[in-house]
Regions:
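C-terminal non-catalytic interaction/assembly regions of soluble proteins
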Residues: 1-23, 316-320, 333-549
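Gly-rich Lys/Arg/Thr-decorated short loops/hinges at beta-loop-alpha junctions or inter-strand turns
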Residues: 65-73, 128-140, 198-210, 235-238, ...
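N-terminal phosphate-binding or glycine-rich loops at protein starts, especially the Walker A/P-loop
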Residues: 1-18, 63-113
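Short glycine/serine/threonine-rich phosphate/pyrophosphate-binding segments
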Residues: 79-89, 112-113, 145-150, 171-179, ...
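Glycine-rich oxoanion-binding loops at beta->alpha junctions
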Residues: 30-63, 112-163, 200, 211-216, ...
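Accessory alpha-helical/coil subdomains and C-terminal extensions
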Residues: 100, 164-169, 175-192, 207-412
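Helix-enriched interaction subdomains in cytosolic or periplasmic regions
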Residues: 2-50
Length: 549
C-alpha cells in the first residue's frame, strides 16, 4: 500500500487511554437499570439481558486468562475512527493474552452470516492505525434480525473458537447487537456480544453516551469546507451559498457546523417541526434574511440545511405518509404497478386527501412529480433523492421576485449549491476521535474479559484530558423503547434528536439574529494533528456546551 507523508507520520501516533485502562482493571457494578421506555415490553423481550447494572472500570489486580478469540464487525455507514476502535480492541485483546486472536467479518454483518472473514494480524493492523475509512474489513448494511442468521453466525463463531463478537455501528446496528446478545444468552451458546457507538449523524447519544464516534471529525471536516465557502462568499460578495449537510434523522451536524462557522442562516429540522412551520414559512424565513442583508448592501450569504429537513415539515411529513400508503399494494406490501408515469400521478392525485393534494400542488412541478414517482421496492417515497438545497433556493428566488415587484426587496439574488456528506465519513480521525475510538475498542476487550454481554462500550467525561476519561459499559437494553417500524412494533434504540431546550441549541438561538444580519463568519481551517492543544485536541462545541459546569 502506497502511503502519503501524512499517513506515514500519523501511523506513529499513540492514542491516549483513560487512566483506568492503563493497567489491570476491576469492574464496579452500579444499580440495576431500566429501559428508557416501554419497560414491561422490553423486559419481556429481553429476559436474559434486561436490568443489568452499569459498569465502571477502576484499577484492579492482574489476573491470568486462558486464550480466547474475538470477532469484530463494522456495520452501516462509515465514520472516522473505525480503524482505531479495531486497533484498540486488537491491542486490548492481545494484552490479555498474546495467544488471543481477532477475526474481522468481511463487509459487515453479511460476513458473519456468509462465513466470510479474515484474521487481523499485527502486520495488517499496523497498516490501518489512525486512518480513516472502514476498508480494513469493509462495512455493510445487512440487518441481523432473523433466527436463521443467528444460527449461521454461531456456526462460524464456534468453528473459529470465538468467545465474543464486537459490533461497531449506529442505533440500528446496536439494536441488532442487543437482539443477538439476548438470543445467544437464551440459547446458552456462550458467546458474548458487545456494541460500540458509531455514527457521524450524532443521533446515538444519551445520558450514558456523550457522543458517537466520528461526529467530531466529520463536523470539523465539513466546517473547514463551510469556512472556505464563507471566505469565498465574503470575497466575491455576489452569491448566496445553500449548503446541505448529512443527517437525515437529526440536525446535530448542521447545529455543530453552525456553532463552528457562524453562517447567516442555519435551519434546525427539530425546530421546524416543533413550530409546525410550513414550507412557505421556511422559505419566508430565509428570504427575510436575504432581504435584510440586501438592504445593507450585502447580496451574499450562507445557509446551512440539514439533509432530513423536508421530512420534518409537518404538512409534507403528512403528505409523504399518505403517499407511502396509497403507493403500496396492501395485498402484497410491495409497490403498486402502473402503466406509466401519467397514470401514476393521476392515481395519486385522486387517492390522497384534499389537504395533502393542496400541499402537493404548492410544490414546484418537478418536485411534486418526484414525490409521486420515485419509490423504493416497498412503495415508500425516496425523500433522500430530493435536492432540498435547490428546492429552497428556487422558492426563495420566486419569493424575492414577488417582493421586488411589491417594492419590498431591492437586491440581487444568485445561488450556489453544495451537499457535504461523503466528504466527512472517511476522513482521517481527529486526535479526539483517534483517542476516543481507541479507548472504546480497548474498553470493549475489558468488558469481554469480565464476561459481559449485551453491553455497549462507553467512555465518559471526554471534555477532560484523556487520562481523566471514565471507562465502562452500559446495558444496551437501557436505551431501548418500542417504535413503529415498517408496519410493526419493534424494540429499537431511541434516536437522539436536537434538544430545543439543550445548551447547544439555546446558545445558537441567542446568536443567530446577529449572524443573520452581520457577516460574522468564522474560519476553522483544516483538522490539525500536531501543535498547541487548543488547536489539536478540542472537542466539538456541542459537547463543550453540554458538559459546561
Amino acid at each position: 500500500m502506497e502511503k502519503s507523508a501524512l499517513q506515514i507520520a500519523r501511523a506513529a501516533y499513540q492514542p491516549k487511554l483513560p487512566k483506568a485502562l492503563q493497567g489491570p482493571v476491576k469492574a464496579v457494578e452500579g444499580a440495576a437499570t431500566q429501559s428508557v421506555g416501554n419497560q414491561e415490553e422490553i423486559k419481556a423481550l429481553f429476559p436474559n439481558t434486561y436490568g443489568m447494572p452499569v459498569i465502571t472500570f477502576e484499577a484492579g489486580e492482574a489476573q491470568e486468562l486462558p486464550a480466547f478469540n474475538v470477532g469484530v464487525i463494522l456495520s452501516g455507514g462509515q465514520a472516522p475512527g473505525g480503524h482505531n476502535v479495531i486497533s484498540g480492541l486488537f491491542d486490548g485483546v492481545k494484552s490479555l493474552n498474546p495467544a488471543n486472536k481477532l477475526y474481522g467479518f468481511i463487509l459487515g454483518p453479511g460476513g458473519l452470516v456468509d462465513h466470510k472473514y479474515m484474521e487481523i494480524t499485527s502486520e495488517i493492523m499496523d497498516e490501518y492505525r489512525n486512518t480513516g475509512g472502514f476498508d480494513i474489513i469493509g462495512s455493510g448494511r445487512t440487518k441481523l434480525e432473523k433466527e436463521d442468521q443467528f444460527e449461521k453466525g454461531i456456526e462460524i463463531l464456534r468453528e473459529l473458537g470465538i468467545k465474543a463478537l464486537v459490533i461497531i455501528g449506529g442505533d440500528d446496528s446496536n439494536t441488532n447487537a442487543c437482539v443477538l446478545a439476548e438470543y445467544y444468552a437464551a440459547k446458552k451458546y456462550g458467546v458474548q456480544v458487545i456494541g460500540c457507538p458509531k455514527t457521524i449523524d450524532g443521533d446515538l447519544k444519551n445520558e450514558q453516551i456523550e457522543t458517537s464516534f466520528g461526529f467530531d471529525t466529520a463536523c470539523k471536516t465539513y466546517s473547514e469546507l463551510i469556512g472556505n465557502i464563507e471566505r469565498d462568499c465574503n470575497s466575491a460578495r455576489k452569491y448566496w451559498h445553500f449548503i446541505k449537510l448529512m443527517g437525515r434523522s437529526a440536525s446535530h451536524i448542521a447545529l455543530e457546523c453552525a456553532l463552528q462557522t457562524q453562517p447567516n442562516v442555519c435551519l434546525i429540522s427539530e425546530e421546524v417541526e416543533a413550530k409546525e412551520m410550513s414550507l412557505d414559512d421556511v422559505v419566508t424565513y430565509i428570504a427575510t434574511a436575504v432581504a435584510n442583508r440586501a438592504a445593507d448592501g450585502n447580496n451574499f450569504g450562507t445557509v446551512l440545511i440539514p439533509e432530513g429537513l423536508i421530512e420534518f415539515i409537518p404538512a409534507i411529513k403528512k403528505l409523504i405518509a399518505e403517499l407511502n400508503e396509497v403507493l403500496t399494494d396492501p395485498a402484497t406490501g410491495e409497490s403498486r404497478e402502473f402503466a406509466g408515469a401519467e397514470e401514476q400521478i393521476a392515481f395519486v392525485k385522486g387517492a390522497i386527501a384534499k389537504d395533502n393534494l393542496a400541499v402537493l400542488e404548492s410544490l414546484p412541478a418537478d418536485v411534486a412529480r418526484q414525490l409521486c414517482l420515485d419509490r423504493d421496492p416497498h412503495g415508500n417515497v425516496q425523500v433522500s433523492l430530493i435536492e432540498t438545497e435547490k428546492l429552497l433556493s428556487r422558492m426563495v428566488a420566486d419569493k424575492l421576485a414577488a417582493w421586488k415587484k411589491e417594492g419590498k426587496y431591492v437586491g440581487k439574488f444568485s445561488a450556489q449549491h453544495h451537499f457535504f456528506g461523503y466528504e466527512g465519513r472517511c476522513a482521517a480521525p481527529s486526535n479526539y476521535d483517534a483517542d476516543y475510538c481507541y479507548s472504546l475498542g480497548f474498553n470493549a476487550s475489558r468488558l469481554i474479559a469480565n464476561g459481559k454481554t449485551g453491553y455497549m462500550s462507553v467512555i465518559k467525561n471526554t471534555t477532560a484530558p484523556a487520562a481523566e476519561w471514565i471507562a465502562g459499559g452500559v446495558p444496551i437494553t437501557m436505551m431501548m423503547n418500542i417504535e413503529r417500524r415498517n408496519g410493526a412494533n419493534k424494540p429499537v434504540i431511541r434516536k437522539a434528536l436536537v434538544e430545543l431546550d439543550g445548551a447547544p441549541f439555546k446558545f445558537f438561538a441567542s446568536k443567530r439574529e446577529q449572524w443573520a444580519k452581520e457577516t460574522a463568519y468564522v474560519y476553522p481551517g483544516p483538522i490539525q494533528y500536531w501543535g498547541p492543544s487548543e488547536v489539536c485536541d478540542q472537542t466539538t462545541k456541542t459537547l463543550q456546551l453540554e458538559q459546561a459546569k
